[in-house]
Curated annotation (Swiss-Prot):
Gene from which this protein is expressed: pyrB
Pathway(s) served: Pyrimidine metabolism; UMP biosynthesis via de novo pathway; (S)-dihydroorotate from bicarbonate: step 2/3
GO cellular component: cytosol
Name of the protein this chain belongs to: Aspartate carbamoyltransferase catalytic subunit
Species of provenance: Staphylococcus epidermidis (strain ATCC 35984 / DSM 28319 / BCRC 17069 / CCUG 31568 / BM 3577 / RP62A)
Keyword tags: Pyrimidine biosynthesis, Transferase
Length: 293
């Protein structure tokens, strides 16, 4: 694999290969490769806890040496372009770049680089490693995707997770539905929009999305009061109680407790939210291994 930029660039067989390797790392069936003497730099131009720390843990476990990069103290503050920043890191011997950026498809500016790039999120575009860890979590639960009914709820328009998961899960055979305020509908995605209360007792997976307040300021979109949103579109106790016995709840996090999901349900028996985070490290080890081998 040359780069990991978008879920649309991955075939179903490549997806299965990556989640299989990640599952084998997790179970201990597959020994961890060691990339001693190779260097990685994580360039995060947007805030992150899970993705950044998960990549760092994966890199450390694989023996990579981390070249620290902080946007606040870099020449980006002097106006240096993303390409020149990345070309500099390539020139001094960095072997892999992990990049999160607010610009959709930022990687199109970097096609002259000769080192692999792992996209850790581009604006409201794609978040391939999040999608892959979600797929891994679903696979652990069900062993297949064919015919699963998946409801993705929330800020569809501004969510790179919704976009990545829609394409990949549909390709794998799942039935994806959206539930969203009309202000946050994305008409470029062809999944049907439904009322959450009409389907909550029929779905296999409820995938909640964070309300992207930071992107609403840019687009001038309407905001909701927390309780208003929670009652109309969130996972309340009443909705949780209607879920099928074997249904699971997912969220890419960070979670706005009491908004997308009732706080007490974050670690409820059907929740796989922290399992997703655990799987993220193993999945990112699989991605790094595929990019460097």
């Amino acid at each position: 694999m040359e780069h990991l930029l978008s879920m649309e660039h991955l075939s179903n067989s490549e997806i299965y290969d990556l989640i299989t390797i990640a599952c084998q790392f997790k179970s201990g069936e597959r020994p961890l490769p060691q990339f001693n003497g190779q260097y990685v730099s994580n360039l995060f131009f947007e805030n992150s806890t899970r993705t950044k720390c998960s990549f760092e843990m994966a890199e450390q476990k694989l023996g990579l040496k981390l070249i620290n990069f902080e946007t606040s103290t870099s020449s980006v503050k002097k106006g240096e372009s993303l390409y020149d920043t990345c070309k500099t890191l390539e020139s001094i011997g960095v072997d892999l770049l992990v990049i999160r950026h607010s610009q959709n498809s930022y990687y199109e500016e970097l096609n002259q680089l000769n080192i692999p790039i792992a996209n850790a999120g581009d604006g409201s575009g794609q978040h391939p490693t999040q999608s892959l860890l979600d797929i891994m979590t679903i696979y652990e639960e069900y062993g297949s995707f064919e015919g699963l009914n998946i409801l993705i709820c929330g800020d569809i328009k501004n969510s790179r997770v919704a976009r990545s998961n829609y394409h990949s899960l549909t390709s794998l055979g799942a039935n994806v539905m959206f539930s969203s305020p009309k202000e946050w509908v994305d008409n470029t995605l062809e999944a049907p929009y439904v009322e959450i209360d009409e389907v909550i007792d029929k779905v296999d997976i409820v995938m909640l999305l964070r309300v992207q307040h930071e992107r609403h300021g840019i687009s001038g979109e309407a905001n909701f009061a927390a309780e208003e949103y929670h009652q109309q579109f969130g996972l309340t106790q009443a909705r949780y109680d209607k879920l099928k016995e074997e249904a699971i709840v997912m969220h890419p996090a960070p979670v706005n407790r009491g908004v997308e999901i009732k706080s007490e349900l974050v670690e409820a028996p059907k929740s796989r939210i922290f399992k997703q985070m655990e799987n993220g490290m193993y999945l990112r080890m699989a991605v790094i291994s595929a990019l460097l081998q």
